[in-house]
């Protein structure tokens, strides 16, 4: 385990911030889109920690970029990796700690405005997306900060909630239990302790998907996909990170979920999605296509 080390000197116009990046690659390497993401995170971090469950060492391109590298066994999903990365930090040194992963492409554009966004300025736990989800154990809709990008600020870092939650992380094999216990659980614990949660894109106030959102993706030439989109796309709650991807970009969220392009749960027209990304963020498209070609 790397030694706990002090942060680099923070820029005077921003909070002292650490970023813990959870990495996994099926082939054990660092994809170019991940390298690019870390390069874009670096200016916003006083300490940049990478925890990998697939690589034993950093590539040369990242050795001067990453402050701390933690290789670990592939157990415990991303929360296990964040737990290991957080253990290398003295949280009292930081105004904010971000936990992020490689399940998204991006930042596609400057992350700075999102980090200063007034919609999340007063939150103790915040993220790019706040959505609602139900699970077998919790039943009804549970508002929570989606875990692919979340930030913990001073009040949470100093709260008993922080230590109680992160000390309780243990490897869990069932993905739904991970979501229930940890992704939803962190937001629930914060709310119960009187801490505030927020998201740049808040699905509770964004409203359901409109016909105009779905219509461009419907096609008589692809009836099965179109029917899947029509049926699933109008349900609430939905996962905005994979369905409302364009709304997120327009709201200032500089990321697109990998799962949107690999799995396409809702049945969007991926040709339209990639064409739009090519228009909006042409520099990112070769990285996205390269990753999809390599990993499927």
Give short role names for the model-derived ranges:
Residues 1-296:
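ER/Golgi luminal nucleotide-sugar-dependent glycosyltransferases, focusing on the catalytic module
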């Amino acid at each position: 385990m790397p030694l706990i080390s002090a942060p680099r000197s923070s820029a005077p116009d921003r909070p002292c911030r650490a970023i813990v990046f959870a990495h996994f690659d099926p082939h054990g390497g660092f994809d170019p889109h991940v390298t690019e993401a870390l390069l874009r995170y670096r200016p916003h971090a006083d300490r940049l920690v990478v925890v990998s469950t697939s690589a034993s060492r950093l590539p040369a391109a990242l050795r001067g970029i990453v402050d701390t590298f933690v290789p670990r066994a592939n157990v415990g999903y991303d929360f296990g990796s964040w737990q290991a990365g957080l253990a290398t930090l003295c949280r009292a040194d930081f105004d904010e700690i971000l936990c992020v992963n490689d399940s998204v492409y991006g930042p596609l554009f400057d992350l700075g405005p999102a980090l200063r966004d007034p919609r999340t300025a007063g939150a103790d736990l915040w993220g790019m997306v706040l959505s609602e989800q139900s699970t077998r154990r919790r039943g009804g809709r549970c508002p929570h900060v989606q875990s692919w990008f979340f930030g913990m600020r001073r009040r949470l870092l100093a709260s008993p909630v922080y230590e109680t939650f992160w000390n309780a992380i243990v490897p869990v094999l069932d993905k739904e239990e991970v979501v229930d216990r940890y992704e939803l659980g962190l937001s629930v614990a914060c709310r119960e302790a009187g801490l505030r949660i927020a998201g740049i894109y808040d699905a509770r106030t964004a409203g359901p998907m409109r016909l105009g959102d779905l219509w461009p993706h419907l096609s008589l030439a692809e009836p099965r996909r179109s029917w899947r989109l029509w049926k699933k796309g109008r349900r609430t709650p939905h996962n905005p990170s994979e369905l409302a991807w364009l709304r997120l970009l327009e709201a200032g969220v500089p990321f697109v979920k990998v799962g949107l392009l690999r799995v396409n749960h809702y049945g969007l027209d991926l040709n339209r999605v990639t064409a739009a990304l090519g228009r909006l963020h042409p520099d990112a498209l070769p990285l996205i296509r390269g990753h999809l070609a390599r990993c499927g």
